[in-house]
């Protein structure tokens, strides 16, 4: 499906051509236009295998094990960090609330 759309786009752009190519261009205008596509569509047809390869590889990309976790997973990166921070905060709160630990901290 994507290849058909790509081929139709290439065909349409080669038929329509570049709208700015109707008149003569100065050197400055030519240097500015060097990054654009060719008016006859030859650049697109030469790059067609490269474009098709890129589209194919993008659609068949293998997922890595790191990215495959569900967002609800309790061991995902953000939840793991938040849980660790909560544990630290709870431990600090217990130290502050426990009088024996507070005296030991003040003495040391």
UniProtKB/Swiss-Prot annotation:
Propeptide feature ranges: 19-25, 89-108
Primary localisation category: secreted
GO cellular component, one term: extracellular region
Compartment(s) of residence: Secreted
Residue positions, PTM Tyrosine amide: 77
Composition-biased stretches (Basic and acidic residues): 90-101
Coiled-coil annotated spans: none
Start and end residues of each stretch annotated as Disordered: 61-108
Origin: domain of life: Eukaryota
GO MF term set: hormone activity
Keyword entries, A-Z: Amidation, Cleavage on pair of basic residues, Disulfide bond, Hormone, Secreted, Signal
UniProt keyword annotation of Disulfide bond present: yes
Signal peptide: 1-18
Compositionally biased residues, Basic residues: 78-89
Disulfide bonds: 38-43
Xref: InterPro entries: Adrenomedullin-reg_peptide
Expression tissues: Expressed abundantly in the spleen and thymus. Also expressed in adrenal and pituitary. Not expressed in brain, heart, kidney, liver and stomach.
GO biological process assignments: adenylate cyclase-activating G protein-coupled receptor signaling pathway; positive regulation of heart rate; regulation of systemic arterial blood pressure; regulation of urine volume
PANTHER family: ADRENOMEDULLIN, ADM (PTHR23414), ADRENOMEDULLIN-5-LIKE PROTEIN-RELATED (PTHR23414:SF6)
Annotated function: Seems to have a peripheral vasodepressor effect and a central vasopressor effect.
The family this protein is said to belong to: Belongs to the adrenomedullin family.
Protein name: ADM5
Lineage: Eukaryota, Metazoa, Chordata, Craniata, Vertebrata
Gene designation per UniProt: ADM5
């Amino acid at each position: 499906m994507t290849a058909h759309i790509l081929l139709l786009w290439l065909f349409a752009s080669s038929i329509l051509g570049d709208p700015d190519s109707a008149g003569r261009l100065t050197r400055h205008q030519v240097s500015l236009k060097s990054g654009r596509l060719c008016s006859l569509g030859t650049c697109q047809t030469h790059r067609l295998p490269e474009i098709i390869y890129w589209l194919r590889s993008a659609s068949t990309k293998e997922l890595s094990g790191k990215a495959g976790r569900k967002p609800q997973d309790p061991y995902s990166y953000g939840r793991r960090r938040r849980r660790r921070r909560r544990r630290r905060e709870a431990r600090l709160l217990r130290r502050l609330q426990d009088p024996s630990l507070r005296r030991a901290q003040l003495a040391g």
